[in-house]
Amino acid sequence: MRVVYLNPLGQMGGAEMSLMDLLVSMRAAEPLWEFSLLLGEDGPLVERAQAAGVQVIVAPFPRALARLGDSGGGPVGALWSCLKASVGTIRYALTLRRVLGELRPDIVHTNGFKMHVLGAWAHPENASVIWHIRDYVSTRPLMKRLLRMHAQRCAAAIGNSNSVASDIQTVCGPQLPALCIYNAIDLERYSPSGEKTDLDSLAGLTPAPHGTVRIGLAATLAHWKGHAVFLRALARLPKDLACRAYVIGGPIYQTENSQRTLDQLRAMADELGIADKVGFTGYVADTAGAMRALDILVHASTQPEPFGRVIAEGMACGCAVICSAAGGAVELIAEGQDALAHPPGDEAALAGRMAELVRDPELRARLGRAGRITAERRFERSRLAEEVIPLYQRLSGHPAAQPEAGLANAIGR
């Protein structure tokens, strides 16, 4: 079988790490299948995919297409962005159609809203398109319209949580089958054992005193990831708590108005009077090492989280995790057993949870142990191929496909 994956970015965000987990899982399960990855930009994902034995093709997006999105500007801004991107988008779609024709895939597996639309338009007639949707569609006016328009050209959609799968059905209707396949992670890499990143050095801070409890927020700089809530919660902590905080991550998006800058966050910390309590590392390639350096990992998203990959990673690394209780994130944890939760955007509640964990090392240790057990049970990487392969076989008419165990059963899970 030939499978072509489409992804807009070459940089390593959470969606790209999840895509890599799928590629590795599929390659291990089906070594004789042909896997290709077409990207809209160059970046670290190229080398990682090639190392996994996947053919990589980089077909750079035109600048206007790369910057097209729902972030900021409202309906008028979105319309203007579409008009600016239209000519380049048509040319790109024609190029994509030619490349896909040469690759002759049985399955076109798309990632990212732009590639969902482009893949639906450009795929060969004998190939089935699967949208792997890792975000809510209903909150994006432009992409919602585009996906609804192209849904009839898509054979199935995968949501990375039940929350996302339900959202897909709401937007695209029952004619587009949508199933939930949770993301997975590399449990050998994301483990309590291994080297710890020197976060103080990366952030330009003097080493923290022995016994300091380290609290971190690891995320892209997207507005909704809750950096402002995290910083305001830190400012509420009692001054006598022996803790230091870290903002781990940097900007990765080209879409206009989609993210904060590190300078903006540093200025906010200064205004809150906590500049000496928090460090900013910028982009960190070894996220597992960064998480192992933390005692407490905070997930502070202010909007419902489609999945919350960082939650699974933190649990796998043995961190005591605090997560924002909305969307797919609440599907990942058992509150009070393997993680703590707080209402999205509630800085006072988040501060209370952080203070509770800073003061209680036994609770931190218990949550860390339980979180690792949950990660091993639910997020092991080989599960991805076990769930995706039957879908591929069903849609491509593969002889190994079992009608009664195919897409219909997957949707019913």
Role assignments for model-derived ranges:
Residues 16-21, 222-236, 263, 348, ...:
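A conserved mid-protein helix/loop that constitutes part of the nucleotide-sugar donor-binding site
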